[in-house]
């Protein structure tokens, strides 16, 4: 691409989904319990507009849980936080969290995997 060229994203129906990718610090030794809560099957999340919710670990960071979420909209994500099932999971997980959190939030504008 020439210097100074402008990139114009192609707009499609799947565009403008909302992504939240984050890390959750777990109390030492409690990571696996936290993962159990986060991976519990939830039809409520899907109904609320969650397209993807992946939970992962990395043995090099034994007290960290990684989460990648894809939502239909930022509003769908925010609304999901008010669901009774989500509030219950948050309350259950809270004692397992160290308070260390990080991550990124962004709206998707394209992908090389789709037209």
Named regions from a protein language model:
Residues 84-89, 93:
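Long, charge-enriched, surface-exposed interaction segments in small proteins/subunits
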Residues 4-65, 70-84, 98-115:
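Short S/T/G/P-rich N-terminal loop/turn motif that feeds into the first structured element of a domain
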